[in-house]
């Protein structure tokens, strides 16, 4: 180590210079075991040929493990002034009497296990054995081990049981037992006490039931239990949970699917109904005009037959009113005597009846709306020639809704 090499070189130089002053360090207990959480005193005694102790220095260093390259300083005292450093701050109390370089460490923890170095110097005394080493181990009771199963716990399958404690110093040994009622019996199969692994070649050849693993060291023991059966309940629980989750997901998907289809079907039905009702509101006026025009043609066609029917009787004249194209014109029945020649008979104009609107053909509800036809222009009425037998001439009236009869 570099520290030791330095002191050896320094010792050789002092010897060559003729110096004979020496410091001697003694370690009573090289190996120290301490229980976790307790206090420990690390003894380090020294002697010096120099009477004066004013320049005496004491230093403690620590190796957490042997792989550390350099030790770390945890305590230093010189001239009556002392201080603790690092993870040991406020946890170290140093001795004050001459010849004693011991320290007491409070509340030891597992991380405090390692190598401690006591180094004493009293200039000009640099010759002699001024260092001492102590190996300190913090003892920890085994923590509760973890029992696990490797392999499938089914008949005919090889499996193994393992047992491991996270903490425990010294390292615990592991033992397997079979629980039969209130009795704990060591297993017949062989197992590794250092690793805690119990190998079972064939589950059918192994007695089923509860098994216990116990971790033991010098401070105590801890145990864990495991249930080993061919039909392990944990496997059934996991399978049941998976099946239940899949069924639940399938039900939710089906409900959402049918609900969306129902909403879409209802929306489509409402859309079709509104499309069918649109042409029904636009078919009244064109058919009404056509109906009025047809009635006018029918009245016009009946005029000659009425006149010819009375040719062997007294001469009579029937006036026919042509329907107006204006909607619902008020019609009056009047008789206006015009200057007529003798022998003519006035004829009363019949009262025009307002034709009711024709009922809609049910077929038009489903047919698209017809395009409105252009309104036909009224044809000029032909002039009526006098009937040679009756001598009556029909002329249209000058006012709406009236006719004049001339003989």
Curated annotation (Swiss-Prot):
Entry's PROSITE patterns? IG_LIKE (PS50835)
Task: List residues in topological domain: Cytoplasmic.
Answer: 256-407
Task: Give the record's membrane topology.
Answer: Single-pass type I membrane protein
Residues annotated as domain Ig-like C2-type: 145-229
Location in the cell reads: Membrane
Signal peptide (from-to): 1-22
**Residues recorded with modification Phosphoserine:** 273-274
- The identity of this protein, by name, is V-set and immunoglobulin domain-containing protein 1
Taxonomic source organism: Mus musculus (Mouse)
